[in-house]
């Protein structure tokens, strides 16, 4: 009694497995619906209605600001990505019906993740470090320590380590050794320094003496003009010999003198004019 129902159940499963209908095999751009193979909607379109025995798959284009990038059976389109400038993003390429908007970081920043949802400023290489790889929109700056013989004295996202200055090539001597943050300090040799300083000092002294002499000469000329003004031009005095006239000769005029026996200057031309009148 118990074995009969079990045997019936076993044979029922066996017959069902043997006579089951094979699964519907659809193409790459199709999908199965009720034993039918319906066409997928192309990129840029969404599914409205599945196909039937009498109609094909019904699709509709995505709206403005939407897209679908693959063959699909989606009921809704995806919205274009928004490039938020407050997060350091800008649009690299506008989205279409079948492509999404592409965002990149603004100049001087890079993505914080592989999805580039936000950006952050490039790192600076501190003094003592140089830029090994300049940052891009996706990757940050890569820094490396300056090796022996090189230095970097700035914080920069672009500057590499610079080689120490060669004092020997410039004909100088090294006065201070360079570090990874400072360059070598070069200077003149002691003898060379003397040869340079002496001519420069003599040139400066000569210039000072020349200027002093010029100033002294100009001062003397001004003082001489102030003490000896130009004498006024005087009329010539006619000299008359008394022996040229007959008769008694009058006594010679007495010349007046001032204190300290200085003669009084006669007024120009009077005596000569009187003598001429008497002669006439």
Curated annotation (Swiss-Prot):
Chief location: membrane
UniProtKB keywords: Disulfide bond, Glycoprotein, Immunity, Membrane, Receptor, Repeat, Signal, Transmembrane, Transmembrane helix
TNFR-Cys repeat start-end pairs: 25-60, 61-103, 104-144, 145-187
Glycan-linked positions: 153, 180
Pfam families: TNFR_c6
Cystines in this chain: 26-37, 38-51, 41-59, 62-77, 83-103, 105-119, 111-116, 125-143
Signal peptide stretch: 1-20
Ranges where the record places region Disordered: 225-252
One annotated Gene Ontology cellular component of this protein: CD40 receptor complex
Extracellular side: 21-194
Transmembrane segment boundaries: 195-215
GO MF annotations, alphabetized: signaling receptor activity
Location of this chain's protein in the cell: Membrane
SUPFAM superfamilies tied to this protein: TNF receptor-like
GO biological process, one term: immune response-regulating cell surface receptor signaling pathway
Cytoplasmic side: 216-280
Tagged with keyword Nuclease: no
Membrane topology category: Single-pass type I membrane protein
The protein's role, per its UniProt record: Receptor for TNFSF5/CD40LG. Transduces TRAF6- and MAP3K8-mediated signals that activate ERK in macrophages and B cells, leading to induction of immunoglobulin secretion.
Quaternary assembly: Monomer and homodimer. Interacts with TRAF1, TRAF2, TRAF3, TRAF5 and TRAF6. Interacts with TRAF6 and MAP3K8; the interaction is required for ERK activation.
Protein name listed in UniProt: Tumor necrosis factor receptor superfamily member 5
Gene, per the UniProt record: CD40
């Amino acid at each position: 009694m118990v074995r009969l129902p079990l045997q019936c159940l076993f044979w029922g499963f066996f017959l069902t497995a043997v006579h089951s209908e094979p699964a519907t095999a659809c193409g790459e751009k199709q999908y199965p619906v009720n034993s039918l193979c319906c066409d997928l909607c192309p990129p840029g379109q969404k599914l409205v209605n599945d196909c039937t025995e009498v109609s094909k798959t019904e699709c509709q284009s995505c709206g403005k600001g939407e897209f679908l990038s693959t063959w699909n059976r989606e009921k809704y389109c995806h919205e274009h990505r928004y490039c938020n400038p407050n997060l350091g993003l800008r649009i690299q390429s506008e989205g279409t019906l079948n492509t999404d908007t592409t965002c990149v970081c603004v100049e001087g920043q890079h993505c914080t993740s592989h999805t580039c949802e936000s950006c952050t400023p490039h790192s600076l290489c501190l003094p003592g470090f140089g830029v090994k790889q300049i940052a891009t929109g996706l990757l940050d700056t890569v820094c490396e320590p300056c090796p022996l013989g090189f230095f970097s004295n700035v914080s920069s996202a672009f500057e590499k380590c610079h080689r120490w200055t060669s004092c020997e090539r410039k004909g100088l001597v090294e006065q201070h050794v360079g570090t990874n943050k400072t360059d070598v300090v070069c200077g003149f040799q002691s003898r060379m320094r003397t040869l340079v300083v002496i001519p420069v000092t003599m040139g400066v002294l000569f210039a000072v003496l020349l200027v002093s002499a010029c100033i002294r000469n100009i001062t003397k000329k001004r003082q001489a003009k102030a003490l000896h003004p130009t004498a006024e031009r005087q009329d010539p005095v006619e000299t008359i010999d008394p022996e040229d006239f007959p008769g008694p000769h009058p006594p010679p005029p007495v010349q007046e003198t001032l204190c300290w026996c200085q003669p009084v200057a006669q007024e120009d031309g009077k005596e000569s004019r009187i003598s001429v009148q008497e002669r006439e």
